[in-house]
Amino acid sequence: MAGKTKKAPAVKIPESEQGSDAQRNLDPRGKRSPDSPILVVIPYLAREAQGRELEYAVAGWRRHFKEEHHIVIVGDHHKVVDTGDDITFIECPRIDDVPGQYMPHLDHVHKFRKVREAYPDVKGFIYACDDMYAVNDFTMIEVLFPKKDREIIGDRNSANGWHRDQWKTKEMCLKERLPIDNWVCHLPVYYEWDKLFEIYDKYDCEHESYVVENLYFNTYYKNRVPVQLSLLHDNLKCGVYRAHPDMSIVREAFVNKIWISNGVTGWIPELDNMLKNYYFGSR
């Protein structure tokens, strides 16, 4: 008579390694509960817009994000906020400049606090930029998937505030004995409010500008091995960051990537026309 097969003992995963609430609430179909609809928060500063970026970004979320969600534009008003019940505007003027600090990082702390005040019962949100354009379908699985870009290269003496913050953040990670992976991929990321505010408070992010994504993910995901992004091999992003990119690669991205994004230099007429035709046809 065959003996009974013993079940393997349950493995208790420490809470610190269980991942985010969003990950724990995902089922195999990418559906999420109970924190639904998912907030998609896009900070917007009108004076830095170069064209219709925000319209394209919103159109991408509406067409391709296959989850119940609600878009929040925080910052300056844009006509796109009046185009449906699935989008809300929170007015939040840019804070005054602080000498020696990189203002977008300080300003985002201010803006995200405003969003938290408006949605106190929501556990977290997706942070996205107005220059990230979804061109193929995705769910929370792709947003939560651990990914990194090239190693942080910063310069404490740079005239560029972003480069100074990269250096300062890397030094802080080393001081705290954290990994120095660069999680800033110019792709949407999911933050849990409580954990994000712990980072804000610990590092005084309202007054000291840091690359918060790297403090956050190197703290709470320090035992993860994120995938290195590669234009040739991943299906996630095509970044347009030069004035004269290979447009054949950009055209292919509408088929083989989930997002297209751009920098200031990469906002060129060819890209603008491609996105306009993709989302709105001849309009």
Located regions from the model:
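Active-site-proximal specificity loops/subdomain of glycosyltransferases
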Residues: 81-120
